[in-house]
Amino acid sequence: MRKGGIDMANKIYTIGREFGSGGREVGEKLAAKLGIKLYDKELLQQAAKDSGFCEEIFENHDEKPTNSFLYSLVMDTYSVSGYSAAPFLDMPLNHKVFLAQFETIKKIAEKESCVIVGRCADYALSDNPDCINIFIHADLDVRIKNVSRNLNITENKARDIINKTDKQRASYYN
């Protein structure tokens, strides 16, 4: 959309991140600097509201594997038009949650400029020319120190949590 020669399209910034790398903090700073909203876990609340599922369902399935390759390319670009089609009704719950999150991400991107942390938002918005994708990486030692400090746990425990989270995220995304 253009207004008076100025591009008025919503700008969307997606932030993928390694656990403990500071991705959420980068997202918060970016959103504050640009004066736009940040979506992270808040996206789960919105998806629950939009879909009619309770919020706990989204929290329990948040960034959990669904036998991915980005969940079979979002279920072959989900030939389910709307949520009333028979294939959707027969789908396992974790698949419905995955689709509901994607739909919410797309709705938010249409509505407003924002920063979205995680939730495969880069893939959900891959066809959006006004989407800028960022990935935050940090050395393992830095991540261990961050997680240890943020969760008030030992560095060994932090390393274990990072390894587990990295595996979960990899199977969710890949």
Region spans (language model):
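Glycine-rich phosphate-binding P-loop
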Residues: 15-28
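Small-molecule kinase domains that catalyze NTP-dependent phosphoryl transfer to phosphate-bearing small molecules
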Residues: 67-74, 78-79, 154-174
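Short beta-strand-centered segment that lines the nucleotide-binding/catalytic pocket of NTP-utilizing
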Residues: 37-48
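Conserved phosphate-donor/acceptor-positioning beta-strand/loop module used by diverse small-molecule
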Residues: 127-150, 155, 160-163
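ATP-dependent small-molecule kinase phosphotransfer cores
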Residues: 48-113
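Short, Lys/Arg-enriched N-terminal segments with co-localized hydrophobic residues
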Residues: 1-7
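RNA pseudouridine synthases
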Residues: 108, 120-128, 146
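Extreme N-terminal starter segment of soluble prokaryotic enzymes
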Residues: 9-12
